[in-house]
Amino acid sequence: MLGFTYYTPTKVAFGKGSVERVGELMNQFGGTRVLIHYGGQSAVRSGVLDRVKKSLDEAGIFHVELGGVVPNPHLAKVREGIELSKANGVDFLLAVGGGSVIDSCKAIAYGLAEPEHDVWELYAGQRKAKACFPVASVLTIAAAGSEMSNSCVITNTDTEEKRAYNDDLARPKFAIMDPELTMTLPDYQTEAGCADIMMHTMERYFVNSGTMELTDALAEGLLRTVMHNAEVLHTDPRNYDARAEVMWASSLAHNGLTGCGSDGGDWMPHLLEHEMGGMFNVTHGAGLAAVWPSWARYVYKDCLPRFVKYAVNVMGVTPGATDEETALAGIAAMEEFYHRIGMPVNFKELGIDPTDEQMAEMAASCARACGGAKGSAKVLHQSDMEAIYKMLK
């Protein structure tokens, strides 16, 4: 087991009715002037936005609102939020939504804390943040794990770049997690969320370093739990217990727990998907599902023991005559699972058809974003990235 630092400062209020605690928790963490950031009209129609505002009003906390966050959140909305927050003396950012809203909130918090700099410089790798305004969330979509993570991803539509920035400064102060708020999600969004949750753990699982018996057991248990409940929700979308299991898994999958003792993870499936999201605006979890089988078949021989372990302990594969046979059976079983929950496993099923030139462009951009090469299961260079994209055709 490699050495690690595990830091998870987010206070979680989980369960039915927890939304009503937002004012109490905001006071506890010193928020006095709050930007409520949200996405589309679902937050309004569901009543959750009114519940949040009522709780803040009862706690005597000033608030201003900014909606309009879209999936693969845009840099332009972040800049709008920074200016609105400055004009209103905002000292705390509250996201009401899923990962896209929380990520947009984190980016606003970075920009607000260092107004002399362009916030995109963080995502472009040009500098590191020195400060960040406090952030919290009322979670309405279980997927990204941003409610407890140090990560946020923003899309620059001018350059068609989707980039991540990770820093503990942006870990939320608290997270309100009521599974009932996810009941009205469309099935596709629910299942894409489950794919995203699983991938956050799988990125940390498929590594070539560290001996992590306990961490592996936690990761495998989380993956089996999400798979089971994803199938439950596919046929019974209002099942509270299944919603609760998936929501809690969302947080544990991306707060660092399932990577303790490893080298930090592989992260190439995410980076490959980021290019697809930047160019084609695909749903993130669905894009990850589409990428993973091709990536896995490209790298598995270089990380064979982990793929065998995954096949047996997570996918329930009976060991074959050879380790390679077992690993490939595990990958095939994963594809079958994705299909059972309505997730794509290639470009066609994802609904995009990139040209050879676009795949080459995505590979070049991906290589630039990761400094030329990246990966733990197998270190990938630009030519490898392009080869994987071609496998998705």
Predicted feature residues:
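ATP/NTP phosphate-donor binding region
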Residues: 1-92, 347
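C-terminal charged capping/lid subdomain of soluble metabolic enzymes
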Residues: 307, 314-393
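A glycine/threonine-rich phosphate-anchoring loop and its flanking beta-alpha core
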Residues: 114-211, 309
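Fold-independent oxyanion-binding glycine-rich loops
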Residues: 10, 16-17, 39-40, 69, ...
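Active-site segments that bind and position negatively charged phosphate/pyrophosphate groups
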Residues: 204, 208-333
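Glycine/serine-rich anion-binding loops at beta->alpha junctions
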Residues: 90-106, 140-146, 279-282
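Short Gly/Thr/Asp-enriched flexible loops that form oxyanion-binding sites at enzyme active sites
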Residues: 51-52, 82, 101-115, 148-149
